C-alpha cells in the first residue's frame, strides 16, 4: 500500500509445505509459519497488515519470479518456479489483492529492488548461471 507506506516482500521457495493448498493455511500457529512457502508468507503479510489496520483489498501486488532455474534438468511435472508464480496469483486473487504488475516465468532468475517509500519495483531477469546443474548466489 504505497499511499500508507506499508509494503512487504517475500522470496518463496515452494507454494506450500505440501499439506496445505493455496486456499489457506490451516492448523499452524503464527509462530510456526515460514515465509519460504507462498501461502504462509502471504498469511504472515496479511497478519501484519491487520496489526496496522490496513485492509488487504486496499493494497496491490507486484509479483516477480517463477523462472526455471534448472532448464537442463528435464523432470516430470511442472517446474517449481511456475508452481510458485501460479500460487502467488491464486493466493492474491483469493484475498482480493489486485496484481498491478508482474514478470513471471521464463528461464533463469531475477534481481529485484523494492522501494517501499514509493512502491516502485525494478527487476531484471538473468539467465541460468551454469546450465542448470546447480544454483549460485
Can you say where each PLM-predicted feature lies in the sequence?
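Conserved mixed alpha/beta catalytic, RNA-binding, or beta-rich assembly cores of soluble enzyme
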Residues: 1-52
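Conserved active-site and cofactor/substrate-binding residues in soluble primary-metabolism enzymes
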Residues: 4, 33-40, 44, 58, ...
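Acidic, glycine-rich active-site loops and adjacent beta-strand->loop/helix elements
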Residues: 13-17, 65-69, 105-107
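Short, well-ordered secondary-structure micro-motifs
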Residues: 20, 72-74, 112
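Short glycine-rich phosphate-binding loop at a beta-alpha junction
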Residues: 57-65
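Phosphate/ribose-phosphate-bearing ligand recognition and processing surfaces
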Residues: 68-81
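Divalent-metal-activated hydrolytic enzyme cores
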Residues: 83-137
Amino acid at each position: 500500500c504505497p499511499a500508507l507506506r506499508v509494503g512487504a516482500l517475500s522470496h518463496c521457495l515452494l507454494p506450500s509445505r505440501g499439506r496445505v493448498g493455496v486456499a489457506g493455511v490451516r492448523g499452524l500457529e503464527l509462530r510456526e509459519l515460514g515465509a519460504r512457502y507462498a501461502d504462509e508468507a502471504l498469511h504472515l503479510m496479511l497478519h501484519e497488515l491487520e496489526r496496522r489496520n490496513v485492509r488487504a483489498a486496499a493494497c496491490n501486488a507486484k509479483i516477480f519470479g517463477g523462472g526455471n532455474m534448472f532448464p537442463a534438468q528435464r523432470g516430470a511435472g511442472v517446474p517449481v518456479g511456475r508452481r510458485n508464480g501460479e500460487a502467488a496469483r491464486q493466493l492474491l486473487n483469493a484475498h482480493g489483492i489486485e496484481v498491478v504488475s508482474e514478470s513471471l516465468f521464463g528461464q533463469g532468475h531475477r534481481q529485484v529492488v523494492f522501494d517501499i517509500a514509493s512502491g516502485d519495483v525494478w527487476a531484471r531477469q538473468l539467465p541460468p548461471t551454469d546450465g542448470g546443474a546447480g544454483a549460485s548466489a
